[in-house]
Regions:
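Anionic, Ser/Thr-rich low-complexity intrinsically disordered regions
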Residues: 76, 97-98, 104-112, 122
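Short acidic-glycine-tyrosine-enriched beta hairpin
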Residues: 67-81
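A generic "binding-loop/recognition-motif" signal
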Residues: 30, 38, 48-49, 67, ...
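A short, N-terminal "cap"/entry segment at the start of jelly-roll beta-barrel domains
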Residues: 1-28, 112-136
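Glycine- and acidic-residue-biased ligand/ion/polar-headgroup-sensing regions
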Residues: 50-60
């Protein structure tokens, strides 16, 4: 793949119900394009990678450490390494945002087979709850 490309050339992965992800990665930083479709709730979690998000469309309730805020187009969230954070889609409109991670998150790479206990727990919590129970 060329070093200059478009998102159309990257596979789309539905990594939890209603969450579509495309990932572009270098050696030390990666960028993802995320789309939330439906009533998406991402429970509290943390990871080693620093994360910067840019919301393009739609609205989210966000929690980063102890700060809670509604965010929308043009909002930027800076999430330091190992800070607990959570998100909930607001309204019916799809939410589209871009994220940059450093270091890269190996579990986001297509075909990666290694374990990621924190991601596995997030999936488990997400999949085993009723939508009415998914409170963050």
């Amino acid at each position: 793949m060329s070093q200059i490309t478009t998102w159309d050339e990257f596979p789309t992965v539905e990594y939890v119900k209603g969450v579509l992800r495309q990932t572009a990665s270098g050696e030390k930083v990666m960028v993802t394009r995320i789309v939330y479709q439906g009533s998406v709730i991402i429970p509290e979690h943390s990871h080693e990678a620093e994360q910067i998000m840019l919301v393009v469309s739609g609205r989210l309730w966000s929690k980063v450490a102890d700060e809670e805020k509604e965010v929308g187009p043009g909002s930027i969230l800076v999430i330091p390494s190992n800070w607990v954070h959570a998100f909930r889609q607001l309204g019916d409109e799809d939410v589209v945002f871009y994220e940059a991670f450093a270091p890269i998150r190996l579990e986001y790479l297509v075909g990666f087979k290694g374990p990621d206990p924190s991601l596995a727990m997030m999936h488990k919590r997400f999949d085993e709850t009723d939508e009415s129970d998914r409170k963050v």
